[in-house]
Curated annotation (Swiss-Prot):
InterPro entries: Adenylat/UMP-CMP_kin, Adenylat_kinase_CS, P-loop_NTPase. This is Adenylate kinase. It is an enzyme of class 2 (transferase). It comes from Campylobacter concisus (strain 13826). Pfam families: ADK (PF00406). Belongs to the adenylate kinase family. GO terms for cellular component: cytoplasm. Monomer. AMP binds at T34, R39, N60, L61, V62, G87, Y88, P89, R90, Q94, R132, R144.
Amino acid sequence: MKNLFLIIGAPGSGKTTDASLIAQHDEKFAHFSTGDLLRAEVASGSELGKLIDGFISKGNLVPLDVVVNAIVSAIKSSNKSNIIIDGYPRSVEQMTELDKVLSEQDEISLKGVIEVDVSEDVARARVLGRARGADDNNEVFNNRMKVYLDPIKPIRKFYSEKELLHVVNGERGIDEIVADIKNLLAKLI
């Protein structure tokens, strides 16, 4: 049985860094982003990978059901028993599809959804302060924040009703945040 943990949060919340640090320092955990999972599936040469490559190579979005199947495939083929995926789900549709697929199999159990909570001001300061790419500007940040905020209430409600949602204060030092998430993961396994 694989234990699945989802880490969600606003752009700049630190969710990817948090998940990466946990996986680097605890060999029981693997960390994936959705993009990593899709690229790994393509690299595997599987039929699913060929299907994904057909969309990506033409610059098209990969259909939702294909993305979720890639996530499930990567989780099942991982040599780790605890999987952290950050930044997923990003929409009610993604959440619903993942829930449907997970309910149809018995090899993966969703153990928790961790929201790294930061204010919009903190998120903005972090994203604009890091300026990792050309897309790290105020206009793009506002759009990314809207994409995050629009579905977050129904996503929180859905996972709260399943008693899976755990909120961590992301406005502290990285060591404190990671320690809190590690403690939470240990309780949920």
